[in-house]
Amino acid sequence: MTDQTRAHINGVRTVGIPVRDQDRALEFYAETLGFEKLMDAPVEQLGGRWIEMSPPGSAITIALTHAREDVAGVDTRIRFTTDDAAALHSQLSASGVDVDELLLWDGIPPMFDFRDPDGNVLYVSEVPSQQV
């Protein structure tokens, strides 16, 4: 097979986040984080539903996948972006979200991490919209 005919991966579409209570997670990601629900369908093979959401205008989605008790609450390594990390940090803190300190280190954009209701760790970095 030559390089010209070789198949390759050309993008990222969806990343999964394991959650114990899909209804609670759906409410958190929609109401607290402002994500849009794109799909919510039962999937017997997964033992729950396929719930797909995204930040407004994003081509990449998250799937809130039903998880066993011992699977949810992981460091997802997922990084979201915002135009204003300090404002979002304050807003999430005021909403009662478990948020760590806002990091303001020389040479890197402001960032912080937080946990969803299942304890999954997620990250936010300040990146102006025109750079995303």
What are these regions (language model features)?
Residues 9-10, 16-59:
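Core segments of cupin and vicinal oxygen chelate
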Residues 16-18, 54, 79-83, 125:
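Short hydrophobic/aromatic beta-strand micro-patches
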Residues 28, 86-91:
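Short amphipathic alpha-helices within nucleic acid-binding modules
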Residues 12-14, 73-78:
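Eukaryotic phosphotyrosine signaling hubs
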Residues 47, 69-73, 130-132:
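A short local loop/turn or secondary-structure capping micro-motif enriched for an aromatic residue
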Residues 57-62, 118-122:
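Short, charged/polar, Gly/Pro-enriched secondary-structure boundary elements
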Residues 56-60, 69-72, 85-87:
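Short, charged/polar surface micro-motifs in flexible loops or helix N-caps
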Residues 1-8, 14-17, 38-41, 49, ...:
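Vicinal oxygen chelate
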